[in-house]
Amino acid sequence: MRIEKIETYKLIAPIEPSFGWSQGWAEKRHLLLVKITGDDGTVGWGETLGVPSQSVLHEILAPLVIGQDPMNRSGIWERMFQRSGFYLSNSAVGLGACGMSGIDIALWDLAGKAAGIPVCEMLGGRVREQVAVYATGLYYTENETHETLCKEAVGYVEAGFKGMKTKVGRLSINQDVERVAAIRKAIGSDIHLMIDANQAYNVSSAMRIARKLSDYDIFWFEEPVNTQDLDSYLFLKSALPMPLAGGETLKTRYEFEKFLSRKAYDHVQPDVAICGGLTDMQRICHMANMCGIQVNPHVWGSQISIAATVHLTSTLPPCPQAFYTVPYIQDPVFELDRTPNPIRDTICSNPFQPENGLITVSKDPGLGIEILEKEVKKLCVEGGYTVCSQQA
């Protein structure tokens, strides 16, 4: 099989209610979908978070992929990486890596369908049949009260989640501590509770809030400082009274290497739609395991990203190695976004659904999901469709 056509769809959907975090406020959800068609008509789907990466994907990357064999994913990845590095510099970070991620995920889906096997088997086979997920929600909302916040948190417990994550960094330190304290009281001591600052603090502020939260059994403190500030992560790793997590915005194994080799995290969080797709994320995960750092992937997209992450996470070895393994302790977990997202909720006919905090790995070919192209086209903005069939 040869790759015949690459299409992209820029999707935007308004949401209600809107919500915020330390770096912004969301009133819409954005996504870039990638559809790759083989010369036999087989289709694979991918996605990336960087909507501005559409022009990079269409003009620079797609022509390099047309005419290639989708079974040669490593070769295609290196071909894209070399060209991205040449045009965009700095080891294909930024929009280049986002575009590569979308194409790469679609190639794995396409290849799996062509071979008649699920992506997890193409990645080496499952270590576990089910993957643990935690609820990501508890954002800042308009007219928020501790009562509404705690009602949301208790809802996640009742839905079977064994862990959840809330935001810090938008309010004063004392106000955020009060939010976290209210959540902990509402959910009890048996549920894992994580906090995410989205890079809101400097080292001293991160230490201040961490000390104030030390009595609330925080499972990890995510992105307290700028994602590229290695020295601050190294300091906080040794000083914080709770584990440190990060890495969701890093691109390719080359950016991850400097953090992993120095053991700057307790938990690393690559995002398959940002870091370089399944091809490079698998390398990143192996690197992390060798460094004794648990992988707990970041996910912030549609069922395409969820499916890709389920398949890859099912193949990851326990960290640390153990005969009897427990999610959160040895087995990886990844986040399941619970905020409003019409794109996630409408474009797939057979979405992955959690039961008691676990998602069962699909055994269907490729990613194991069916994309409803009619719904994709409904959400595609005017001028947001591109098609490339011309080889570089």
State each model region's role:
Residues 118, 132, 192, 243, ...:
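Proline-centered loop/turn at the N-terminus of a beta-strand
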Residues 3, 41, 61, 103, ...:
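Conserved, mostly hydrophobic/aromatic
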Residues 363-392:
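Extended hydrophobic packing segments that form well-structured cores
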Residues 56, 211, 217, 228-245, ...:
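Shared catalytic-loop signature of beta/alpha-barrel
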Residues 36-114:
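Metal- or metallocofactor-binding catalytic centers and their adjacent structured scaffolds
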Residues 48, 93, 135-137, 166-168, ...:
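A cross-domain feature marking catalytic cores of carbohydrate-active enzymes
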Residues 124, 129-240:
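Metal-dependent enolase-superfamily TIM-barrel catalytic cores that perform enediolate-based chemistry
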Residues 1-45, 49, 340-347:
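Structured beta-strand/loop patches that form or line metal/cofactor-binding pockets in enzymes
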